[in-house]
Structures are given as C-alpha cells and as structure tokens.
Swiss-Prot record:
Belongs to the bacterial ribosomal protein bL17 family. Keywords: Ribonucleoprotein, Ribosomal protein. Gene3D superfamilies: Ribosomal protein L17. GO terms for cellular component: cytosolic large ribosomal subunit. GO terms for molecular function: structural constituent of ribosome. The keyword Metal-binding does not apply. It comes from Prochlorococcus marinus (strain AS9601). Pfam families: Ribosomal_L17. InterPro entries: Ribosomal_bL17 (IPR000456), Ribosomal_bL17_sf (IPR036373). This is Large ribosomal subunit protein bL17. Part of the 50S ribosomal subunit. Contacts protein L32. GO terms for biological process: translation.
Length: 116
C-alpha cells in the first residue's frame, strides 16, 4: 500500500515520469512559463521550487544537485546567479499556477505555470 503519495503518478512509469518532470522543470526555468495539464503543473511546482531553493542556498553541493537534475548546465549557472536577487526575501511560493481553457482534443484541464 502506498500511503501519502508526494507527487502524482501522472499515469506513467517512474522513469518516464522523472524524465517528464526534468524536462518541464528545465523548460520552466528557461522560458519562465509553461502551458501544460493541471496535474502536471502541480507536480512540476514541487520540482521547480526545490531547484530554486537549491539556487538560493548557493553552495557547491546544491549546485551539483541542480546540475544533476536540470538538463542544461548553462541554465543552472544563470539560475544560481539570479536566484538570490530575485527570490532573496521570499521563503517559498516561487511559482504561480493559472487555470486556462480545457484542451480541445480530450477536454483535459490545462494550466499555465509561471515563475513569480
């Protein structure tokens, strides 16, 4: 029995789910906003906030953890440079989820997740 799931399973095996979240996190940090389904946006929020918290910490160990998760090494360096000045006074809540219209093909609930 799996009690208290921390992230939704998103109807994918573990390796595909991790790759999906890594890709979405990389895209969110690069672009600043991502349009995806509501369930994926909620799962992405945890990962993105974890990466920004690592960037605020700024230690070598946290930088290495971020490089191991985010696909683009240059993106990690730019995140670590900008995170303290952008989110220095904020203790969490670095992202915002805004619901949008449902997807036309399958009527899935869509959302825009963006960095605050």
């Amino acid at each position: 029995m799996r009690h208290q799931l921390r992230i939704p399973l998103l109807s994918k095996p573990a390796d595909q789910r991790k790759a999906l979240l890594r890709g979405l996190t990389t895209q969110l940090i690069r672009e600043g906003r991502v349009t995806t389904t509501k369930a994926r946006a909620k799962a992405l929020r945890n990962e993105a906030e974890r990466m920004i918290s690592l960037a605020k910490e700024g230690s070598l160990a946290s930088r290495r953890r971020a490089i191991g998760y985010i696909y683009d090494k240059k993106l990690v360096h730019s995140l670590f440079e900008k995170a303290k000045e952008r989110y220095g006074d904020r203790e969490g809540g670095y992202t915002r989820i805004v619901r949008t219209v449902s997807r036309k093909g399958d009527n899935a609930q869509m959302a825009i997740i963006e960095l605050v």
